[in-house]
Every structure is written in structure tokens, then in C-alpha cells.
Amino acid sequence: MNARSRALLLLLLVAASAAVLPFLRYLTDDTFIHLQFAKHLVQGKGFSFNAGEPTYGATSPLWVLLLAMTGKLLPISVAAPSDPASMPALAWAAKGYGLLFHLVAILALVLLGKRLGWDDRTALGLGVLLAAQAWTLRWALSGMETPLAVACVALALYGFAGVLVRDRPGWGTGIALGLASLARPECTLLAAIVVVTVWMGAERRPRRALEVLAGLGAALLPWLATAWTWFHTLLPNTAAAKAGATLEPGPFVAALHAVFQVELAADALPLALFVLVLAFGNRSNALPVARGRRFFWFACVAWPALLALSFALEGVQVVSRYLLPATPCVLLLGMASFRWVVATNLPNRYGAALALFLAAFVVQNALFTALVSAPSTIAHTSGLRSSLVSIGIWARDRTAPNASFAVADIGAFGYYSERHVLDLYGLVTPVLAPITVREGYNAVVTRALYEVAGRPDYLIDRHPREGRLAQDQDQPSPYRFLFARRIPNLGITRPGGFYYSVYAIDWRVMDQTRQRVASALPGGPQRRIL
């Protein structure tokens, strides 16, 4: 890059930093799950959500370890503040890391464009796409692991291009893929794709593939050995807690529908250009001649497609951040498709066409951010503070230290309450994950199916209707309604208002109710139901 391009790159990074400011105070309930695990590591209570109970309930061990190391080394408090309006110090650290990794990802994509042989303006344009992408902006300062995963993927793609295009060693690529997998477990799929394509497309195939595998192992194996020692499992509990019904048509279609909604909201233009190439291109004029380059682009197509398909097959309830690790490939394909379309139709108007393409992309994503994404996050964060955060502070101040709570959304409540949590979705209470997937959340609550994991003192129910479990009862209810707090949305895909209703559970009434129901069933009182 010449001096002018380097100055433009610096300007791009400054603009990218400014673009995320609308999300400066954005927090999600899942953010507090990471903070809770990191807090307990710093306090010597293990890799645990409930203090002293190790569990693989964190999707991103790398993010938790990074936050814990920060809490250990810096003079900051890892405990929750007493004021629900105050930002936890550890959350500020997470936001700082998020911005850093967001900028690293942009820089890596610009360098990747240069490595592919693109001119400075095209490589910088690729960075503009990532800096302006609405979902990237939304999650950059959320305190979640998403920017870390995107940065690791971008660095892995940079190394991957070096292996296939320039016959560079694969160690760094493997390490970046391993770190990406520790940031988001779905990135193990990308690692598999890269290993296969390096084996098939690199100039020195066995050697380069083994180098990638060695780098991957160097990053992954220490954590896998630790996970087996601590949890006796290699897979996070989220694999079951966030999945629906595997291979069933309903969840499959719902997941694909969510994927299309997420992608079209931000990446409609790059995807439209890619569709044009698929429709009108052919092997001779759309694919590069060099074998390594062909396999690089095959991998860029395979990663987003297989990621979306895996979510659909598992019935995952897809949200935008799950797809962001594939965004660098989507944008790469969009820019490559743009270059082909312009070279085919407007070869002498490349500069003007590039400016128009980038402007259209920026405007689309800026409008979506201003009209939909940013207002949603502001409302959500305010509602989170006034609901789960406030309930957590109430529990910390007004309930016994040994009290336990059954909760659907565990993060903010667990972090602030310092009370034992029984997770109704099974993230940190894995025995409940298959039950909730099979029976549904409503059945778990109304039939007290969570009892298999223990008898909590309180229940925090999430439902559009306030205090619903204590209403319309023909018989005494085991749930004594205490109070409720409202949250205006649970994200863009769940915009309706919800109530978090707090109940005290009377297990004596619960048992008596079951006995009466059992006595009325064929076979008499010996038949006990949950």
C-alpha cells in the first residue's frame, strides 16, 4: 500500500470506531453469562456459573479466559455494582476488547484483499463493507465474544489465502482456526473445510495440510484436555441448550427462514451480486485458473452455506450473531462478484461502480441500524436493567444466601443476585436441556419438570402475561406471585413485550396437588406425574 492508501486505512479504522458508538451501552443477558464465569474464575470459584460447580456452560471459553485474565491483572472490580444503571467494570473491559477485535477484523480483511491481488481501493472497499455491516456494528460493543470470533476467522482466511495462493506455511492458519473454534464452537466446521481444501488445493498438499492441523491442535488441545479434566466432556452444554428438534421439518424451515432474514437485512447487495455470477457466469470466465485460488473460493462458498445448513438440521433458534463468523466470506464473495460483474459489463467504469456499490451498501446498513437495530438495543438494554438486573439485586438483598431460583434467562440475574440458579433451558443445568427441547418451556414451568434438577425456592417465569401461573387456578397454586418486571423486547426477532414474574414456590402445595391429580387417574394414587 502507498502512503495515501495507508492514510485512508487509518481513516477507515477511525470511522469504524465512531460507527459503533450508538451501541456503547448495549448489553444482553448472555453478556452476563460470560461475566459470571469470568468473575468466578477470578474469585477462585472455578469455571462455573454457580460458584464452585464447574460446568461447560460458556459457549466461548476463550472469551471467558480473556475476561478472567483481565479481571485478575487489572485493578478493576469483577463483582456486580449495586446500582442497576451502572455498567460493570468487567463489561467495559469486554466492550474494549470488542472494539479492538472489530478493528483487527477490518484490518485483516483489507490485507486479505491485497493478498488476493486486488488493488488498494478494492481492498479498502472490502474493509468498508465489514465496518458498515449492520450486524457487525450491533455486536461489536455488546460484550459478547462475536468480534473475537470474526477477527479470528478473518485472520484464518488471510493465512488460508497465503497457503493456497502463495504457498505459505499453514501453522498460523491452524492457530487462528483453533482460536476461532474456542471463540465460537461452530468454527470447527470452518477448520474442517480449510483442512480439506488445503489437502486438495495447495501446491504441497500433505505438508501444508499437516501444518494447518498442527497449528489447530496447538490451539485446541490444551483447552480440550482442560475441559475433559474439569467437566468430563469436550462439547459445551450450549450444543443441546440452543438446539431444537433435530431433523424435524418445522425447526428446519424456521432456522432457514431466520438465516435468510438476517442475511438479507445486511448483506442483500453482496448476495445479489453473487447470485448474478451463479446465474450468468461459467467455469471459463468466473473461476480463476489457478487451482489454489479455485479452492479458496470454494471454501468461501462452503463455509456460510454449511453453517446455515447445520443450524437448520439441528433446529437452532438462529440469531444474527451466530452467523457473523461467516460474514467475512459473504463479503469476500460479494466483492469478488462485484469485480466480475463490472469487468464483464463496465470495464472502464470500475472506480465509479465501486463507489456506487459501497455507498449503496453503507446506506442500506446505516438505515437498518438507525431505524431498527439501534433503537431495539436501547430499548432492550433499558428493559434488561429494569427487569432481570433489578430482580437480581432484589434477590441479593432480600432473600436468604442459600436460596435457589429456577430461571429462564440466567445471565444478568445470576451475575447480580449471587444466588444459586437452576437454568430452565439447561445451559448450566444440562439435565434440563433435553427435557426443555422435548417438552417445551411452558410444560417445564407449568408441570414443574425442572424438579429433576432440584427443588428451587423461587421461580422467575418469562411470559407475555404477568403473573400467569397464579391466575385462573381451580385449585390452590404452588406458585405465590410476588411481583413482575417488564422488558420491551428480547431482540429484533422477538419484539413483543415480556414479563419476568417472580414466584415463591410452595412445594407442600405442589405435592398435594399432584396427589389429588394422581388419585383421579385410572389406577389410583400410585400413579405420580410431574
Give the residues covered by each predicted segment:
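Membrane-interface alpha helices of multi-pass inner-membrane proteins
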Residues: A16-V20, L126-A131, A154, G170-R184, ...
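Membrane-lumen/periplasm interface segments of specific transmembrane helices
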Residues: F23, L27, I33, F37-K39, ...
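Transmembrane-helix signature of polytopic, membrane-embedded enzymes
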Residues: A3-A7, V78-A89, V104-A132, V150-A151, ...
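Transmembrane alpha-helices of multi-pass, membrane-embedded glycan-processing enzymes
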Residues: T59, W63, L67-L74, A85-P88, ...
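Hydrophobic/aromatic-rich transmembrane helices and adjacent perimembrane loops
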Residues: A140, A183-P185, L189, D267-P270, ...
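Membrane-embedded, lumen/periplasm-facing catalytic core of multi-pass transferases
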Residues: F357-G414, H420-P464, Y479-L530
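Specific aromatic-rich, kink-prone transmembrane helix
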Residues: A108-L111, V128-L129, L148-V165, G172-L177, ...
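Signature aromatic-anchored transmembrane alpha helix within multi-pass, membrane-resident enzymes
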Residues: R6-V14, R121-V128, A192, L213-L221, ...
